[in-house]
Amino acid sequence: MAREFSLANTRNIGIMAHVDAGKTTTTERVLYYTGKIHKIGETHEGASQMDWMEQEQERGITITSAATTAEWKGNRVNIIDTPGHVDFTIEVQRSLRVLDGAVTVLDAQSGVEPQTETVWRQATEYGVPRIVFANKMDKIGADFYYSLSTLGDRLGANAHPIQIPIGAEDDFIGIIDLVTMKSEIYTNDLGTDIKETVVGSDEFNAELASLDFNAEEYTELANEWREKLIEAIADFDEDIMEKYFAGEEIPEAELKAAIRKATINVDFYPMLAGSAFKNKGVQMMLDAVIDYLPSPLDIPAIQGVNPDTDEEDERPASDEEPFAALAFKIMTDPFVGRLSFFRVYSGTLDAGSYVLNTSKGKRERIGRILQMHANTRKEIQTVYAGDIAAAVGLKNTTTGDSLTDEKAKIILESIEVPEPVIQLMVEPKTKADQDKMGVALQKLAEEDPTFRVETNPETGETVISGMGELHLDVLVDRMKREFKVEANVGAPQVAYRETFRAGTSARGFFKRQSGGKGQYGDVWIEFTPNEEGAGFEFENAIVGGVVPREFVPAVEKGLVETMANGVLAGYPMVDIKAKLYDGSYHDVDSSETAFKVAASLAMKEAAKTAKPAILEPMMKVTITVPEENLGDIMGHVTARRGQVNSMEAHGKSQIVNAFVPLAEMFGYATTLRSSTQGRGTFMMVFDHYSDVPKSVQEEIIAKNGRNAD
């Protein structure tokens, strides 16, 4: 079957924002207007189509990224609705990796919020073009121009309105399109009765006058903002610049094309206005998705590496190219089992065919191919370049794996996974629960790369790690509901890390003789601190075979295993370089095991002089409080070993930005609530790891039963 929509008429977009900005409601309206659903479900009533998990409907938030496909004016729009809560940041990250464009939804009252900054930064890292939708224009305190200023002030984004609202709050009645200079005026809240008029026309003047608005004022405002838009876009388009300086009229099509080009090049962010809940501005936002966000043909060919030659390669978006796709999400479906979501970059794929998982070097059979709408599905026979779909039957594929034609191998850039910052102990209630818990945790970890499951080597307890309390709360809840596992859950603990702060060299010597074959391993290793976030790096600098080549991997393995259980308090060690530069071996007694043990001894010896340190996660905390509570809040931050970075006024509130250790933030919601009579709010997002103070380090070591030496 031939493809239904051309690549030029395909859009792969994400809808992303801070929690509660109205992303899911916006997506619901998109589905309603594109004919995908025939009844609107409200998020706050737990009836949203895209928030299909029980936990999502109970909490009124998005937890997983739901995928759906819609059609708009002859175009296919593949949409991924992503979570806004910081604990589910991997869902945003893996979605952005496979999308071509995004709609950033702002709450028009608050503008850019902490998680907006996080998702914006992630989108910038992946070079994703964006349009901005100032939602909730009907809300008390909604301010389109304040929201615009926060894009520049907090994100440094070159954002400019391509629309301006007519009115705000209860008086939000319409939108002016600055490109076409036409207005849409809404006479009901269903988005069904829309009057379109030309700005400045008699009809426009009469319509606004009938609603008690000053038409002249809005005509003037529209002309002023259109002038600013042309001036901004002229920086990226010489033809428009020439016409602008010559005082010539700029045709609508030319202006649209220039905005599209600057947006796709990630130089410019068009800003729109609306209220998804009141059905205002959603159709215009859909038009902007088609007009300004890229098709798969507009973005550079996907880059990768040929695993056989290690040479760089690429796959242009075309059905004629060899098949290449990236698996970006694994999900367990109660009806069809394990689902692997993937984005096709090039070529086509039929159900029942074979592909090569080049990341794992394993052949996989594609059972069925499904087009997803949240958690419902439609079976399809073929997928084409630019499509997003889910496959049944992939046994070895995990998040970030490349799937390709067996005869044209390529490994695409994978998905970076952030380190977990919080952990807790889980204990099955019965023997039956113990057996089921292992399976449940394994399946949940397959779905979510930021969720880690480990066994404490000393106590045998199962420890689960994740991105925050809500993240682990939801996963434990899923374990109980979906897998029927009853478990006792410990209190949340901080996921500390350990590292070396000084360079040193150390010898690891292991020799054992007990009748028959002995054990002999001898290594000299130089340890140096690595850059933050760079992880562990191993270098083999052996010359002359003093440590035979076949034992070098065992040395690296011995170091990695030792680093999993750090030297100070048993926390994983990070950001260390190790250079194996000398050693000796025995012709008969040397073995992989002996060299593994020797490497482990070298690291423990190095710890005596390498100034080992414990690192703790530092959170970027944003606290919003009434002015009269500002003094209390500054006291809270200081008492929690925090550091205030900035303060800004917003209406009658003060916004405090600070870095605070995660360990000090447990229970802060209760403290803030009582200090502000429930009027204060806070958001936190992981920012970086930092050394704990010496006194705190000693407490941690004492608690974990280790000695500082």
From Swiss-Prot:
Keywords: Cytoplasm, Elongation factor, GTP-binding, Nucleotide-binding, Protein biosynthesis
Regions crossing the membrane: none
Biological process according to GO: ribosome disassembly
Record-annotated tr-type G domain positions: 8-297
An annotated Gene Ontology molecular function: GTP binding
Main location as per UniProt: cytoplasm
GO cellular component: cytoplasm
InterPro entries: EF-G-like_DII, EFG_II, EFG_III, EFG_III/V, EFG_IV, EFG_V, EFG_V-like, G_TR_CS
Keyword set includes Ribosomal protein: no
Classification via CDD domains: EF-G (cd01886), EFG_III (cd16262), EFG_mtEFG1_IV (cd01434), EFG_mtEFG_C (cd03713), EFG_mtEFG_II (cd04088)
SUPFAM superfamilies noted in UniProt: EF-G C-terminal domain-like (SSF54980), P-loop containing nucleoside triphosphate hydrolases (SSF52540), Ribosomal protein S5 domain 2-like (SSF54211), Translation proteins (SSF50447)
One Pfam assignment: EFG_III
Location in the cell: Cytoplasm
Keyword Nucleotide-binding applies: yes
Gene3D superfamilies found in the cross-reference section: 3.30.230.10, 3.30.70.240, Elongation Factor G (Translational Gtpase), domain 3, P-loop containing nucleotide triphosphate hydrolases, Translation factors
Binding site for GTP: 17-24, 81-85, 135-138
Family: Belongs to the TRAFAC class translation factor GTPase superfamily. Classic translation factor GTPase family. EF-G/EF-2 subfamily.
Entry-linked NCBIfam families: EF-G, PRK12740.1-3, PRK12740.1-5, small_GTP
Primary role: Catalyzes the GTP-dependent ribosomal translocation step during translation elongation. During this step, the ribosome changes from the pre-translocational (PRE) to the post-translocational (POST) state as the newly formed A-site-bound peptidyl-tRNA and P-site-bound deacylated tRNA move to the P and E sites, respectively. Catalyzes the coordinated movement of the two tRNA molecules, the mRNA and conformational changes in the ribosome.
Stated name of the protein: Elongation factor G
Source organism (scientific name): Lactococcus lactis subsp. cremoris (strain MG1363)
Gene behind this protein: fusA
